[in-house]
Amino acid sequence: MSESLRIIFAGTPDFAARHLDALLSSGHNIVGVFTQPDRPAGRGKKLMPSPVKVQAEDKGLPVFQPVSLRPQENQQLVADLQADVMVVVAYGLILPKAVLEMPRLGCINVHGSLLPRWRGAAPIQRSLWAGDAETGVTIMQMDVGLDTGDMLYKLSCPITAEDTSGTLYDKLAELGPQGLITTLKQLADGTAKPEVQDETLVTYAEKLSKEEARIDWSLSAAQLERCIRAFNPWPMSWLEIEGQPVKVWKASVIDTTTKAAPGTILEANKQGIQVATGDGILNLLSMQPAGKKAMSVQDLLNSRREWFVPGNRLA
């Protein structure tokens, strides 16, 4: 193989852990792992380590969990490791300019979109919601901007009509490690060819919110169906019935026009709950009332048919 590089890995969630796993099998030398501090989780709010920390400790790697990399003493942790390159995957902390310049080959990031489209925090969800035909991963050289660095390598995959953010996440978690290992080989060999991002093609993937996931019936049925897939598994699209939130897991578009006001229930049977939208009809197929498990519309109608009387309007 190419030169074995001294690598610092920085990441936090499962998506990052899958990249660390690929690095551990690549023959490179992982000299340190940075991940976010343990966070309260679950009903008991017990402090839980990140997936990256669990994996790193299992492999006996040194783990660092600073709250910030701005303090000089935390930057010194990076400097002392004398890395050739720092690999950053969904770390969640800002890397100051001083840290970016410490490794011999700089810092590289695995981003879940085909840059310069969808810079920012939620590229997977935004690409789905926008109706993009494809997405992918970009390995880029990091600079002080938000996903503005030169691109080193890209891999793409189609977005299907059945994809959710969950399934796309898994696809990109397969592509990312492939692109990362190839990029590291090119950096080690001196064959990497950085490409400047075209600023005229930039779009931004803003962070998601639960309120944003509330179904807006004035949108088209096609937009709402994509929204439902984009927000699955988090934060989940939802509507309000009798003052309680009801999550929507799955829906389809019925290619028929209607003059009914957006939000009006047109039909409610075992084939689905058909609702008028700003353009077209959305057919709700799987839903989850508060405190219950996700269920088919047929099961929901058996217990809550009074919620879905044709002619009534959903909020």
Swiss-Prot record:
One GO CC term, this protein: cytosol
NCBIfam families assigned to the protein according to its UniProt record, in alphabetical order: fmt (TIGR00460)
Protein name, UniProt field: Methionyl-tRNA formyltransferase
One protein family per Pfam: Formyl_trans_C
EC number(s) reported in the record: 2.1.2.9
Keyword Transferase on entry: yes
Gene3D superfamilies named in the record: Formyl transferase, C-terminal domain, Formyl transferase, N-terminal domain
Catalysed reactions, semicolon-separated: L-methionyl-tRNA(fMet) + (6R)-10-formyltetrahydrofolate = N-formyl-L-methionyl-tRNA(fMet) + (6S)-5,6,7,8-tetrahydrofolate + H(+)
Residues at which (6S)-5,6,7,8-tetrahydrofolate binds: S113, L114, L115, P116
Top-rank taxon, per record: Bacteria
InterPro entries, per the entry: Fmt, Formyl_trans_C, Formyl_trans_C_sf, Formyl_transf_N, Formyl_transf_N_sf, Formyl_transferase-like_C_sf, GART_AS, Met-tRNA-FMT_C
Keyword vocabulary terms for this entry: Protein biosynthesis, Transferase
Molecular function as annotated in GO: methionyl-tRNA formyltransferase activity
Root EC class: transferase
Family to which the UniProt record says this protein belongs: Belongs to the Fmt family.
Function recorded in the entry: Attaches a formyl group to the free amino group of methionyl-tRNA(fMet). The formyl group appears to play a dual role in the initiator identity of N-formylmethionyl-tRNA by promoting its recognition by IF2 and preventing the misappropriation of this tRNA by the elongation apparatus.
